[in-house]
Swiss-Prot record:
Protein name (database record): Origin recognition complex subunit 4
Chain positions with N6-methyllysine modification: K7
Similarity field: Belongs to the ORC4 family.
Species this chain originates from: Mus musculus (Mouse)
Coiled coil regions, renumbered to chain: none
Residues reported to bind ATP: G65, P66, R67, G68, S69, G70, K71, T72
GO biological process, alphabetically ordered: DNA replication; DNA replication initiation; polar body extrusion after meiotic divisions; protein polymerization
Any one GO MF annotation of this record: DNA replication origin binding
Keywords from the UniProt entry: ATP-binding, DNA replication, DNA-binding, Methylation, Nucleotide-binding, Nucleus
Pfam families from the UniProt entry: AAA_16, ORC4_C
Function: Binds histone H3 and H4 trimethylation marks H3K9me3, H3K27me3 and H4K20me3. Component of the origin recognition complex (ORC) that binds origins of replication. DNA-binding is ATP-dependent. The specific DNA sequences that define origins of replication have not been identified yet. ORC is required to assemble the pre-replication complex necessary to initiate DNA replication.
Subunit structure: Component of ORC, a complex composed of at least 6 subunits: ORC1, ORC2, ORC3, ORC4, ORC5 and ORC6. ORC is regulated in a cell-cycle dependent manner. It is sequentially assembled at the exit from anaphase of mitosis and disassembled as cells enter S phase. Interacts with DBF4. Interacts with POLQ.
InterPro entries assigned to the protein according to its UniProt record, in alphabetical order: AAA+_ATPase (IPR003593), AAA_16 (IPR041664), ORC4 (IPR016527), ORC4_C (IPR032705), P-loop_NTPase (IPR027417)
Lineage of source species: Eukaryota, Metazoa, Chordata, Craniata, Vertebrata
Length: 433
């Protein structure tokens, strides 16, 4: 009995390690994971970083690609290789994010903190942002340009920095990358293909115009290979026998017709690796001690969860009155061909239905209907077409419905306890109204 319990504990510990290794691989932009289809871009980036770290050259580059294309993973791999070179032990990294550093003052404080120069700056007063930044970089100098401490500035959500007032941060970073004594590399990450159009002329003139594009250009056979590699356990996994069985199961999954159908469907909707990781994470969550190996059913259920319509799910939790208002808006969309409408128009449509079917739906007072309408707006199922003025009446504010007919009908099919007359109203032709 004791040996069986020990064996069970060892099995549970083994699965716990599997979960930890794979979740870390799926959830983090780990520099230890493999790069897929971006070897040329990686070579370009690492070469540029080495020129800054080893030879004291200043450079600037933008990494451009859609969300989930691997921009951060690519950069993390390059930085990891750079930090393994003995010459660049003293390279300093400064990470900024457009969502966090919303203006140049906040950005400057963050730069000072990451450079560990708070005690140097103390109560000094600077005339401008440029003067302050130059002072920080001078504090890092060790004589000539080649012996000074290189600084790598990484700007995530680069396009948000481009929308900041006067683009002061970008101007000064690109300026020092051309003229400063301290070697500086400025690396921007963005999903905007038109990023150069957002830059002011003075900023653009100081940018090197180097761009590295990531476009997820792999085909389905490569996607299938990535699927196998991402699910496989590494050779150094402690329990060799379990790792062998796990990897054999992954190989069988990659040849299963049901799994291939799931992956093909997922690939056709979204081929980025972030989306694949989400699918694999949901399937991995179903692996337990009693169910130690992933199956095609797990992947099918994960695919179903990935493809759920969030807006349609919100509709499942609405009241019958709110459902009636959405159906009224659906008919208005059909009549006026997607033109905006207001509350009064929706209320009139609802009243037409009530007059015909008073026995099945309670006739709510107008303020109650208005409250339900406002709740739909809070849930972002409808949105105002234009900004509301203080003097405008709420009943006549123009709005648009953010659900299409298919979403409404699918949601109604799954809506429990919906009155039959309401369902019939939703499917009725315009002539019925």
């Amino acid at each position: 009995m004791s040996s069986r319990k020990t064996k069970s504990n060892a099995h549970a510990e083994c699965l716990s390690q599997v979960q930890r290794i794979l979740r870390e691989r799926f959830c983090h932009h780990s520099p230890h994971s493999n790069l897929f289809g971006v070897q040329v871009q990686y070579k370009h980036l690492i070469e540029l970083l080495k020129r800054t770290a080893i030879y004291g050259e200043s450079n600037s580059v933008l990494i451009v690609g859609p969300r989930g294309s691997g921009k951060t993973t690519l950069l993390n791999h390059a930085l990891k290789e750079l930090m393994e070179i003995e010459v660049s032990e003293n390279v300093i990294q400064v990470h900024l994010n457009g969502l966090l550093q919303t203006n140049e003052k906040i950005a400057l404080k963050e730069i000072t903190r990451q450079l560990n120069l708070d005690n140097v700056v103390e109560d000094k007063v600077f005339g401008s942002f440029a003067e302050n930044l130059s002072f920080l970089l001078e504090a890092l100098q060790k004589g000539d340009r080649t012996s000074s401490c290189p600084v790598i500035f990484i700007l995530d959500e680069f396009d948000i920095f481009a929308h900041q007032k006067n683009q002061t941060l970008l101007y000064n970073l690109f300026d020092i990358s051309q003229s400063a004594q301290t070697p500086v590399a400025v690396i921007g990450l963005t999903c905007r293909l038109d990023i150069l159009e957002l830059l002011e002329k003075r900023v653009k003139s100081r940018f090197s115009h180097r761009q590295i594009h990531l476009m997820n250009s792999f085909d389905f056979p490569q996607y299938l290979k990535i699927f196998k590699e991402q699910l496989s356990l590494p050779a150094e996994f402690p329990d060799k026998a379990f790792a062998e069985r796990w990897n054999e199961n992954v190989h069988c999954l990659s040849e299963d017709s049901t799994v291939l159908e799931v992956l093909q469907k997922h690939f056709s909707v979204n081929k980025n690796l972030q989306s694949l990781h989400m699918l694999l994470m949901l399937a991995l969550n179903r692996v337990t001690v009693s169910h130690p190996f992933m199956t095609s059913a797990d992947l099918m259920e994960a695919q179903h969860m990935c493809s759920l319509d969030s807006k349609a799910n919100i509709v499942h939790g609405l009241s019958v009155l709110e459902i009636c208002l959405i159906i009224a808006m659906k008919h208005l969309n059909d009549i006026y061909e997607e033109e905006p409408f207001n509350f009064q128009m929706v209320y009139n449509e609802f009243q037409k239905f009530i007059q015909r079917k008073a026995h099945s739906v309670y006739n709510f007072e107008k303020p109650v209907v208005m409250k339900a309408f406002e709740h739909l707006q809070q849930l972002e199922l409808i949105k105002p077409v234009e900004r509301t003025s203080v003097n405008s009446q709420r009943e006549y504010q123009l709005v648009k419905l953010l659900l299409d007919n298919t979403q409404i009908m699918n949601a109604l099919q799954k809506y429990s306890n919906c009155p039959t007359d309401v369902r019939q109203w939703a499917t009725s032709s315009l002539s019925w109204l």
